[in-house]
């Protein structure tokens, strides 16, 4: 995960009166986020107070750094950035963080809820949204996924749950509550939703094609985007229950259906933010496993077959 940040945003971050939160955000970055200074090193006015603060922070920041050394050079042309910026990004770019100094345009992009992006003054709040500690809780204590899922932008949702379609009664009682909770941020911005489940574990009374269309309608209504897509994949290659999104992974010890599902007391759920290197690597590994399912199991895939993180055959 990269953080692309303008010089003005660094000065704003360092000038924040919330020193404790600023220190927490600095630790967050050091533990797993690659920093891309969206300007040349020669652009820093070393004779100014702000320039001195930046260089001093940089020296302290690089001590004990767990990621690559910060990189310099313009990655994003902030002055000419447009509101369609999220759609122009690569798959990796859709999982990065952006702090850029163009408030008018950035606010419009931020409102779309597709990527983590902020303008001048947003630095602490945006980075703090990825400080997700002590999130492991008993699944039975979660009243609804909407209360538990953090408010983080998303373009893609990949749910792997062997028993998602196993019981028609349980399936209908839960009404795709997890998907709805994950789609709460996008606003007029499409979401690609993929559900991977176990072949042979689908209730015979469920019509998969019909259920796909129902879910697609739900996601389009929530996101406000007619370009939202849904894909169902069935496989005998089982995996742990994980949900991978742009910025975090949701791990659960049992089926994601919370209602009427006889959850055991020792079943837990936990959010693993990609701001942590290990968590990001595990999500990448899972994506590689899901890609193998697509490559080896083309006949058991229905729907739009669209994703920013997985590649479907033409």
What is the meaning of each model-derived region?
Residues 162-179:
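Domain-level signal for Mg2+-assisted phosphodiester chemistry and nucleotide/NA-binding surfaces
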Residues 1-146, 175-314:
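PLD/PLD-like phosphodiesterase catalytic module centered on the HKD motif
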Residues 150-156:
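Secondary-structure "cap/kink" motif recognition
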Residues 159-162, 197:
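Short glycine-centered, acidic/aromatic-flanked micro-motifs in structured strand/loop junctions
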């Amino acid at each position: 995960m990269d953080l692309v940040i303008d010089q003005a945003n660094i000065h704003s971050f360092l000038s924040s009166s919330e020193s404790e939160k600023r220190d927490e955000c600095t630790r967050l970055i050091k533990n797993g986020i690659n920093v891309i200074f969206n300007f040349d090193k020669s652009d820093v006015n070393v004779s100014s107070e702000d320039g001195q603060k930046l260089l001093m922070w940089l020296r302290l920041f690089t001590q004990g750094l767990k990621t690559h050394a910060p990189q310099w050079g313009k990655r994003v042309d902030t002055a000419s950035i447009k509101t369609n910026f999220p759609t122009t990004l690569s798959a990796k770019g859709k999982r990065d963080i952006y702090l850029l100094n163009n408030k008018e345009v950035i606010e419009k992009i931020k409102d779309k809820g597709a990527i983590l992006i902020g303008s001048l003054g947003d630095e602490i709040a945006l980075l703090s949204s990825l400080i997700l500690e002590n999130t492991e809780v008993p699944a039975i204590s979660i009243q609804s996924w909407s209360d538990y899922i953090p408010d983080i932008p998303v373009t893609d949702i990949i749910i792997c749950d062997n028993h998602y379609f196993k019981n028609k009664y349980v399936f209908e009682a839960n009404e795709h509550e997890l998907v709805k909770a994950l789609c709460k941020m996008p606003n007029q911005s499409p979401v690609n939703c993929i559900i991977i489940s176990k072949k042979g574990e689908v209730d015979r009374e469920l019509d998969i094609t019909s259920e796909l269309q129902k879910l697609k309608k739900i996601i389009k209504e929530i996101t406000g985007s007619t370009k939202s897509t849904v894909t169902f994949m069935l496989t005998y290659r089982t995996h742990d229950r994980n949900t991978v999104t742009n910025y975090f992974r949701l791990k659960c010890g049992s089926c994601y259906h919370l209602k009427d599902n006889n959850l055991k007391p020792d079943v837990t759920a936990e959010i693993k933010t990609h701001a942590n290197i290990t968590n990001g690597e595990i999500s990448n590994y899972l994506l590689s496993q899901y890609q193998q399912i697509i490559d080896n199991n083309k006949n058991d895939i229905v729907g739009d077959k669209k994703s920013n993180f997985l590649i479907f055959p033409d």
